[in-house]
């Protein structure tokens, strides 16, 4: 019999808990509907009704209405503490101290919700109807000792004197833009950005200053000469060094317009230039290679030129000829200076110079050897 009573009691408690859960869910849905359907509260209106203390305990599924001055009824729900209500039902009933504690919890939650909406815990601590912004905090103490910027000081001044902004608007003065840097002027932007146009987003770097210089006529001439003397093929290199004029700036009292262009070095007959403006190459010796002669100097008797004698081309206009042969069991090496104007035969012989220039240079020719 006791077991049947215990089972029936447990079943009734389970049913009450299930019904309590359904009621709490319906209460939450009803509270959300009431909040969404209510009109937004005017900033200048009286919201002292938010601070009324709730002294009566309500059922978990019931709702109470609080009516303020000049406002409609706002439906709120007492499901903020469903857990404590369910625990009180399970324990078997509610006592008077528990009811008072529940009322205090609901009161604290309502006060916290009102504080989050911009109100304080006092009855009416601030005048919300005079047009001032209650969200602006007072001037906090400068604990770190850091200097404050001018924009912050202006913002605090405008917050302390809200009538100043209204006076500026009434007089037609433009309202200053707070917390923003002034836009750069178009001409200043071009000068600061080194000719890159108006780009307020790219600040001017002081490290770039002084890199660009005004080209002088000397620099222009040097660039032109370098471009002209640059070889067409990368494989061919210049044999003569390129002389670059000094790039030092002229004195301030000197006029660049009267400066004469740099003089070119005098060309000689031994220098030849090709049509592609390649550097001039000096020919050291015009003498043909060994064993070859020009057409007029070749012998008319039909003898071929001598291919064996070695020559010494150390001096212009002369050949050092020598022959090696065997005589009486000895190796004989004979050498002599033969001028360019002489003919080379199979059997070399000493000939006199007929160009009248060799004796002035060669001692052997001058002595008549």
From Swiss-Prot:
The P/V/C gene has two overlapping open reading frames. One encodes the P/V/W proteins and the other the C/Y proteins. Belongs to the paramyxoviruses V protein family. Its main location: host cell. Residues 1-23, 54-320 are annotated as: Disordered. It is found in: Host cytoplasm. Zn(2+) 2 binds at residues 341, 353, 355, 358. Interacts with host IFIH1/MDA5 and DHX58/LGP2. Interacts with host IRF3. Interacts with host RIGI regulatory protein (via CARDs domain) and host TRIM25 (via SPRY domain); these interactions prevent TRIM25-mediated ubiquitination of RIG-I and disrupts downstream RIG-I signaling. One of its GO terms (biological process) is symbiont-mediated suppression of host cytoplasmic pattern recognition receptor signaling pathway via inhibition of MDA-5 activity. The modification Phosphoserine is found at residues 249, 257, 260. Residues 7-20, 99-110, 150-168, 175-193 have a biased composition (Basic and acidic residues). Plays an essential role in the inhibition of host immune response. Prevents the establishment of cellular antiviral state by blocking interferon-alpha/beta (IFN-alpha/beta) production and signaling pathway. Interacts with host IFIH1/MDA5 and DHX58/LGP2 to inhibit the transduction pathway involved in the activation of IFN-beta promoter, thus protecting the virus against cell antiviral state. Also interacts with and inhibits host IRF3. Blocks the type I interferon signaling pathway by disrupting the RIG-I signaling pathway. Zn(2+) 1 binds at residues 318, 337, 362, 365. Keywords: Host cytoplasm, Host-virus interaction, Inhibition of host innate immune response by virus, Inhibition of host IRF3 by virus, Inhibition of host MDA5 by virus, Inhibition of host RLR pathway by virus, Interferon antiviral system evasion, Metal-binding, Phosphoprotein, Viral immunoevasion, Zinc. InterPro entries: Paramyx_V_Zn-bd (IPR024279). It comes from the Viruses. It comes from Sendai virus (strain Ohita). Pfam families: zf-Paramyx-P. The C-terminal zinc-binding domain is involved in binding to IFIH1/MDA5. This domain is also involved in viral pathogenesis. This is Protein V. One of its GO terms (cellular component) is host cell cytoplasm. The lineage of its organism: Viruses, Riboviria, Orthornavirae, Negarnaviricota, Haploviricotina. Transmembrane segments: none annotated. GO terms for molecular function: metal ion binding.
């Amino acid at each position: 019999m006791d077991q049947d009573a215990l089972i029936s009691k447990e079943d009734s408690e389970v049913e009450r808990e299930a019904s309590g859960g359904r009621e709490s869910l319906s209460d939450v849905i009803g509270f959300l509907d009431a909040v969404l359907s209510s009109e937004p509260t005017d900033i200048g209106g009286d919201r002292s009704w938010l601070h009324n203390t709730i002294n009566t305990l309500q059922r978990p599924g019931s709702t109470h209405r609080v009516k303020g001055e000049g406002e409609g009824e706002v439906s709120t729900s007492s499901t903020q503490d469903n857990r404590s209500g369910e625990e009180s039902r399970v324990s078997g009933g509610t006592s008077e101290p528990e009811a008072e504690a529940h009322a205090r919890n609901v009161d604290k939650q309502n006060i916290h919700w009102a504080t989050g909406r911009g109100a304080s815990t006092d009855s009416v601590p601030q005048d919300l109807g005079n047009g001032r912004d209650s969200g602006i905090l007072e001037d906090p103490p400068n604990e770190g000792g850091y200097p404050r910027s001018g924009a912050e000081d202006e913002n605090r001044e405008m917050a302390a004197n809200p009538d100043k902004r209204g006076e500026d608007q009434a007089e037609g003065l433009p309202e200053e833009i707070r917390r923003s840097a002034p836009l750069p002027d178009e001409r200043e932007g071009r000068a600061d950005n080194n000719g890159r146009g108006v780009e307020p987003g790219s600040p001017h770097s002081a490290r770039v200053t002084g890199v660009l210089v005004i080209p002088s006529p000397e620099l222009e001439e040097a660039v032109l000469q370098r471009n002209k003397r640059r070889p067409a093929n990368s494989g061919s290199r210049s044999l003569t060094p390129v002389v670059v004029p000094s790039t030092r700036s002229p004195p301030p009292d000197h006029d660049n317009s009267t400066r004469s262009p740099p003089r070119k070095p005098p060309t000689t007959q031994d220098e030849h230039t090709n049509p592609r403006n390649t550097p001039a190459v000096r020919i050291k010796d015009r003498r043909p290679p060994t064993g070859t002669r020009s057409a007029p100097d070749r012998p008319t008797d039909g003898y071929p030129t001598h291919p064996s004698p070695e020559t010494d081309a150390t001096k212009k206009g002369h050949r050092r000829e020598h022959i090696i042969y065997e005589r009486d069991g000895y190796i004989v090496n004979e050498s002599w200076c033969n001028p360019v104007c002489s003919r080379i035969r199979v059997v070399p012989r000493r000939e006199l110079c007929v160009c009248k220039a060799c004796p002035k240079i060669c001692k052997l020719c001058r002595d008549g050897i």
